[in-house]
Swiss-Prot record:
Protein name (Swiss-Prot/TrEMBL): Thymidylate synthase
One term of GO molecular function: thymidylate synthase activity
Keywords: Cytoplasm, Methyltransferase, Nucleotide biosynthesis, Transferase
Lineage: Bacteria, Pseudomonadati, Bacteroidota, Flavobacteriia, Flavobacteriales
Chemical reaction(s) catalysed: dUMP + (6R)-5,10-methylene-5,6,7,8-tetrahydrofolate = 7,8-dihydrofolate + dTMP
Subunit structure: Homodimer.
Enzyme class: transferase
GO CC, one annotated term: cytosol
């Protein structure tokens, strides 16, 4: 996937060597953007194999408004284990903010769907996970923050906005096209970004379907985009591999409510990636 490999090259060639919260050290850039036309295939990195099951179940978990890893673990997903407390709780992280902002029954996802259906020209179709009132105290442990009703981690993918392009009648288009732009304040390029691309591309496709729209673009905008010092070798290996054609994601066309999707409603076709590459998570 050229856009992703171009990002990797850009950071390796132009990045600033910096320290970081985890003590691992990074090479990073500030401000970068990638664009993916979803009509050209599903943007799933092919220069290493991704664990699609984790991507889908995590997104469904967000949409449920869940913040306990029990659902993830029951479905074989371990990507949040390092940050949960002894009960599996993570505090008011993504799902809580998306569906129950400040515990005041502000359901941003439901409000977004309503706005897309009734006022698609709106410039206010934004979902925010960045809530300063629940950001963790950096001097305290994950467990202490959760006990104090704070998030175990601040959101990396902070907020996203949707845009509906009117159909081009001269081209025979009958439906508007839905595009999504994500602002990601902090991006782990080797481990996190491939997941984030696939997750938000999939979310865009799901919302387009339930709003009777066609998927347009996924636009990925970064703040601090970084490569951890212990991931250089893995990314050089990816750069040495020839990208393969993008797969196609098929959604169950019977689903008309964003909250009715289940794991079996997604079928990825023609995904033929290079072998997986292991890398340590910076905690």
């Amino acid at each position: 996937m050229k856009q992703y490999l171009d990002l990797v090259k850009h950071v390796l060639e132009n990045g600033n060597q910096k320290g970081d919260r985890t003590g691992t050290g990074t090479k990073s850039v500030f401000g970068y953007q990638m664009r993916f036309d979803l009509s050209e295939g599903f943007p799933m990195v092919t220069t290493k194999k991704l664990h699609l099951k984790s991507i889908i179940y995590e997104l469904l978990w967000f949409l449920k408004g869940d913040t306990n890893i029990k659902y993830l673990k029951e479905n074989g997903v371990k990507i949040w284990d390092e940050w949960a407390d002894s009960n599996g709780d993570l505090g008011p992280v993504y799902g809580h903010q998306w569906r129950n902002w400040n515990s005041e029954e502000i359901d941003q996802i439901s409000e977004l769907i309503t706005e897309l259906k009734t006022n698609p020209n709106s410039r206010r179709m934004i979902v925010s996970a960045w809530n300063p009132s629940v950001l963790p105290d950096t001097k305290k442990s994950f467990e202490e923050n959760v006990a104090n009703n704070k998030a175990a981690l601040p959101p990396c993918h902070a907020f996203f906005q949707f845009y509906v392009a009117s159909p081009d009648l001269e081209k025979g288009e009958t439906k508007g096209k839905l595009s999504c732009q994500l602002y990601q304040r902090s991006a782990d390029i080797f481990l996190g970004v491939p997941f984030n691309i696939a997750s938000y591309a999939l979310l865009t496709m799901m919302i387009a379907q339930v709003c009777d729209l066609e998927p347009g673009e996924f636009i990925h905008t970064f703040g601090d985009a970084h490569i951890y010092n212990n991931h250089f070798e893995q990314l050089e290996l990816q750069l040495s591999r020839e990208p393969k054609p993008l797969p196609k994601m098929i959604l169950n066309p019977e689903i008309k409510n964003i909250f009715d999707f289940d794991y079996d409603d997604f079928t990825l076709v023609d995904y033929d990636p290079h072998p997986a590459i292991q890398g340590s998570v910076a905690v």
